[in-house]
A protein has these predicted regions:
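N-terminal Rossmann-like NAD(P) cofactor-binding subdomain of oxidoreductases
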Residues: 1-190, 225-227, 278, 285-287, ...
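A glycine-rich, Thr/Ser-enriched phosphate-binding loop motif common to dinucleotide/cofactor-binding enzymes
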Residues: 121-132, 205-214, 320-324
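Oxyanion-binding "anion nests"
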Residues: 191-238
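Glycine-rich beta-alpha junction loops
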Residues: 36-38, 128-129, 153-160, 194-201, ...
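Generic solvent-exposed, charged/amphipathic alpha-helical segments
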Residues: 17, 214-218, 259, 263
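C-terminal active-site/capping subdomain that shapes the small-molecule cofactor and substrate pocket
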Residues: 226-335
Length: 335
């Protein structure tokens, strides 16, 4: 299978490369592309050193698939042209997610969206914070139905890419030197701070990250009227996103019934030890491909409640981006 990674030197592109290293796809002929600025860099793949080349449209000719993680503007400009060459494009940006007819896919959750996929299709990779939430909630949706979701996120700086990682590192260093931190990526310092909004804020006070979570969840679950209330927050963590989620199910359930429904679901790891030392944290799970769920509970002092609360953690560069994209590629490569 001839595969191109566009944006190979970025935070997600590097993880795509790492996930392809362990992929189920038996024979891979891989080409790496990035901007002119990053061209010439070498990256390892299956024991070889591979040169990253400057992207140009003609270099996509003859590819079977393109894993794209080069930002929304680039994707809007190039993805359709690449797909028109007969190349299947799996795009990690937000550019195509809500476009009618473009599959928005989490393989464990809505694999039916990949049925009948033909070469030359654009497939959208959902938002990182959306992916981990829908994986955790899908078995509950199937078992009990879902009427409403409340989610507050604690999102790491790697969600902004390498520049977010560097800004946090530089600001921490500056503060320890008693220097004023410079803000180039975020509007306020992120070091030792919490920023209560991600991306552009609209006239109604909703930020774009929240809009993504609401609309993508509805599309993936096939429930266009589902009530989703989201508050997205940037925190001074390098890698992995966390979420506090409350979900109103279609019926009252016990903690035990919820755990039974979630147990064994693909890509989901339940942490049932409720001691503080056992809780999954961003630091503990960084680099892992699973979605981790803990603190599963029903509301305090409320009997027969349809509400369920939980803590969800996943690596935003892995399952939240690269791993999900490679899983999509694995699924379509078997057609």
């Amino acid at each position: 299978m001839k595969i191109a990674i566009v944006g190979a030197t970025g935070a997600v592109g590097r993880e795509m490369l790492a996930d392809l290293e362990d992929s189920k796809i038996p024979e891979i002929s891989l080409s790496l592309f990035a901007s002119q600025r990053s061209a010439g860099e070498s990256l390892p793949f299956r024991g070889k050193s591979m040169e990253v080349k400057a992207f140009s449209l003609d270099k996509m000719q003859g590819m079977d698939a393109c894993l794209m993680s080069a930002g929304g503007a680039f994707s809007r400009q190039s993805a359709k042209a690449i797909a028109d060459m007969g190349v299947t494009v799996i795009d990690n940006s937000s550019a195509w997610r809500m476009v009618e007819g473009v599959p928005l896919v989490v393989p464990e959750v809505n694999p039916e969206a990949l049925r009948g996929i033909k070469k030359g299709t654009i497939i959208a990779n959902p938002n990182c914070s959306t992916i981990q939430m829908v994986v955790a909630l899908k078995p509950l949706l199937d078992a009990f139905g879902i009427e409403q979701i409340h989610v507050s996120t604690y999102q790491s700086v790697s969600g902004t890419g390498q520049r977010g990682i560097k800004e946090l590192a530089h600001q921490v260093e500056s503060l320890f030197r008693f220097q004023e931190p410079k803000c180039e990526v975020y509007a306020q310092p992120i070091a030792f701070n919490v920023l209560p909004g991600i991306d552009v804020v609209d006239s109604q006070g909703h930020c774009f990250e929240e809009e993504k979570m609401v609309r993508e969840t509805r599309k993936i679950f096939g429930k266009p009227d589902l009530s989703v209330l989201a508050t997205t927050v940037r925190v001074p963590v390098y890698q992995a996103h966390s979420e506090a989620v409350s979900v109103k199910l279609g019926k009252a359930v016990t903690r035990e019934e919820a755990i039974k429904a979630m147990s064994g679901f693909a890509g989901l790891k339940l942490h049932l030890d409720d001691s503080h030392a056992a809780f999954p944290t961003p630091r503990a799970i960084a680099g892992d491909r699973a979605v981790h769920v803990a603190r599963i509970r029903t509301p305090i002092d409320v009997l027969n409640s349809p509400w369920l609360q939980m803590w969800i953690v996943a690596d935003n560069l892995k399952k939240g981006a690269a791993t999900n994209a490679v899983q999509i590629l694995e699924a379509i490569s078997y057609h």
